[in-house]
Structures are given as structure tokens and as C-alpha cells.
Amino acid sequence: AGRYAGGTPQQKGERSPVSKASPDNILLYLPQKQEDQVREIFAGLAERGFPVQQQRPHITVTFSPRMQPEVVDLAAQLLPAVIPADFRRVGNVIFGTKRKQTVAWLLETTNELEIAARKISAANSDGRGPRWTPHLTMGLRLPREEVPGYIQAMDELTSSHFKELSAVEAAYWRPRTQEKTVLAEA
């Protein structure tokens, strides 16, 4: 728990530089092999001229400008029972209605994780209530006009066999202080 050992957060794949607006997050991380597969897709998209994706591949449970300790405590209670967790890619989703949009893989998971994530989200006063849309962000803050081409390129670069994902770690990530606290591990 606490600060990363064995490398900087950037070496571990967290976004940098950190925006003052970057929220605290409770995140689920993939096994290294799957993370590398996603990064290969990011690299292929960048080679085609799309914006470079620097974020570490993850699935967000909830986020807040300043996460309340009771939300982190609840996540630490609920997530160990459901990690590792299996996910299945079921489509693409676009978040945002303004000039910059986010493209993500839409995911389905177990009822147990879905229930836990909804409880954690509901406990977060800055969250969306008991709603959770499991997804893995593939394109962050993309210009709206690039989204159709981005999705087409993403589909071309993604193996049709890469449908199953796993979450092997849950963590509380604080971008402002570059601190990651592991809440559950497989």
C-alpha cells in the first residue's frame, strides 16, 4: 500500500502530468498481459495520428474531487470478495456531449461485482448514486469530430479474440499526491 515501490507512477503507467482537477479514484487494474494488449492498441492508434493515450488501462468504480474516507473503507470491505473479477467486452460507448468526448469499451461483469460497485458508488456523495457503467477508457478527451474514425481504427486494431478481461487488483488512486493504496489483490 501507499507509494509505488520499484518505479515512478509514470513508469507504472499513471497519467502525468497531473491536472489539479484530476479526481481521486477507486480503480480496478488488469493483469500485465491484458494491460500490455491495451497499450498496443493505444500505440497503434497513436501511429495512425490519433491523440496519445497515457492513462494506465483501468476500470473505474467511482471518482471524486476528494474521496471521503468512508467510501475507501467500504471499497476495502467489499472488493476483496469479488477480486479477481471477469469482464466481457460487449461494445463501445461514447461519454460526453461537448467538444471533447471519451471512447470506451462497454463491459459486463458478475452480479457480485456489480452490486459491490453500485454500493461503493452510492456511498460517494460526489458520485452518480447507485449507478455504475463498467467500462475501460480507450480514448480520453478526443475531439468530437475524430470519434467515428477513432472507433473504426480501434476496432481494426483490436483482435476479435480479445473479448475477455480480468481485474486482478483494486486500488485507491490519488493523482494529486501520486499515491496508490491497494484495496484488493488476486
Features from the language model and the residues they span:
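A structured binding-face within diverse protein domains that lines the active/interaction site
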Residues: 101, 105
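Basic, often amphipathic N-terminal segments
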Residues: 13-88, 107-166, 179-186
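Short proline/glycine- and acidic-rich turn/helix-capping motifs at secondary-structure junctions
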Residues: 91-100, 168-179
